Amino acid sequence: MTEHDTLVLIPARMAASRLPGKPLLDIAGLPMIAQVLRRAREARLGRVAVATDSAEIAAAVAAEGGEAVMTSADHPSGSDRIFEALEKLDGEGRIKTVINVQGDLPTIAPADIRAVLQPFAEPTVDIATLAAQIRVAAEHDNPNVVKVVGSPLSQDTLRALYFTRCTAPFGEGPRYHHIGLYAYRRTALARFVALPPSSLERREKLEQLRALEAGMRIDVRIVDSVPLGVDTPDDLEAARRILAKQA
């Protein structure tokens, strides 16, 4: 993998029920989408673009000197949105690896974006993602904290066996909080978006289960902490405090 065959895509849309218009909300003097764009560029992995159905978001990206690609408003998931963007930006197939950075992670460490590629040293891995060890007791039983159950491959890598909102695995030992940042081999992304929603995906409301049920391999890199996702006004204020200190 090189910066010439890797594409970082940031899906972003305006329709957020708890925080309307959140990609354009100000954080430390910039729209949130511009902050995410900066973090992705700081990872220095190659071309970075925002995939959006909003002209307002595209304009904010352009104002930051970034690249935006317009996509359909009808996509059921961010994975479908980034696949459309990939096909529009690289119809020739030069890009081999795609990283999906959520558009509501303005404080994510660029090192964590780079870390998601490390499982691809193993050629049979289809999809790579991140997790961090749960250290707050209340998170073990919180259904909004998605846990990854996996077989350890090394001190900092798991092979994912399941993702769940339940408290899992049972018994003594660490549990891991899944972080929704993904890297896909291009062939794996094309296969994934062509699959219908799976039974466990619908039950847990976790689209990565579609890949596991189809026999695709997902490996998980363990990082130090979970980045702040901005979903509520309290999250927004926390992100503002974090980035104000870094300014």
Curated annotation (Swiss-Prot):
InterPro entries registered for this protein in UniProt: Cytidylyl_trans (IPR003329), KdsB (IPR004528), Nucleotide-diphossugar_trans (IPR029044)
Keyword Transferase among record annotations: yes
GO molecular function terms noted in the UniProt entry: 3-deoxy-manno-octulosonate cytidylyltransferase activity
Protein location: Cytoplasm
UniProt cross-references to CDD domains, sorted A to Z: CMP-KDO-Synthetase
One matching Pfam family: CTP_transf_3
Pathway assigned in UniProt: Nucleotide-sugar biosynthesis; CMP-3-deoxy-D-manno-octulosonate biosynthesis; CMP-3-deoxy-D-manno-octulosonate from 3-deoxy-D-manno-octulosonate and CTP: step 1/1; Bacterial outer membrane biogenesis; lipopolysaccharide biosynthesis
Catalytic function, reaction form: 3-deoxy-alpha-D-manno-oct-2-ulosonate + CTP = CMP-3-deoxy-beta-D-manno-octulosonate + diphosphate
GO BP of this protein: CMP-keto-3-deoxy-D-manno-octulosonic acid biosynthetic process; lipopolysaccharide biosynthetic process
Homology family: Belongs to the KdsB family.
PANTHER family linked: 3-DEOXY-MANNO-OCTULOSONATE CYTIDYLYLTRANSFERASE, 3-DEOXY-MANNO-OCTULOSONATE CYTIDYLYLTRANSFERASE, MITOCHONDRIAL
Function, as annotated: Activates KDO (a required 8-carbon sugar) for incorporation into bacterial lipopolysaccharide in Gram-negative bacteria.
Descriptive protein name: 3-deoxy-manno-octulosonate cytidylyltransferase
Organism from which the protein derives: Afipia carboxidovorans (strain ATCC 49405 / DSM 1227 / KCTC 32145 / OM5) (Oligotropha carboxidovorans)
Organism placement in taxonomy: Bacteria, Pseudomonadati, Pseudomonadota, Alphaproteobacteria, Hyphomicrobiales
